């Protein structure tokens, strides 16, 4: 399989975050292509635009995308998601839920798919959008897959450090330091604008993420 792994952050983020993410992927002999962009005033929308850019510019047949504060805990994640998306009709990744709990979707923190699937779904934009379902970055892609009877594989939550968020369909809370399938770790809210998260929590999340990376590197 011709697979590309990507992530995104803004240039004002603590550079150690991208550095440590890269170190973890190096540990597993995997290359992650990190898009580092100048920050804009609309980070949520910018995230979607950069994902669009990654898809347009990528040369690979299969794409796996991580948030900058998301890392694998074991190499097994790679074998697992590659097997899942190799049929060219499966969108696979972390389970997320709309703000009002009306709809589950694949979360932008970690997901993978084939270019064939993306094209067959009409090359949906990854832009964040507002709707009755409080649409998030990858929700439109998820919805198109469902409409066309494609396959969705959700990576389920197996642990979390706190319970900031909630998925009603599974009656499960999760938050900063969430682990999926015992294979993927996502810190959450490490690069949000400070208007969304106080500076102390912002720094705490960064430090916790770096500590987790160090644990993985020593394992």
Where are these regions (language model features)?
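Active-site acidic short loop of glycosyltransferases
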Residues: 58-61, 87
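N-terminal anchoring/stem segment of glycosyltransferases
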Residues: 1-49, 53-59
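A structural signal for short, well-ordered beta-strand segments and their strand-loop junctions
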Residues: 64-65, 90-94, 151-157
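Short, solvent-exposed loop/turn segments at secondary-structure junctions
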Residues: 10-13, 39-41, 69-71, 97-99, ...
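Conserved catalytic core of nucleotide-sugar-dependent glycosyltransferases
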Residues: 71-144
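Short beta-strand-to-loop acidic/aromatic patch adjacent to the donor-nucleotide binding site
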Residues: 61-71
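C-terminal catalytic/acceptor-binding lobe
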Residues: 133-219
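Residue-level recognition of beta-strand->loop/alpha-helix junctions
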Residues: 34-38, 95, 156
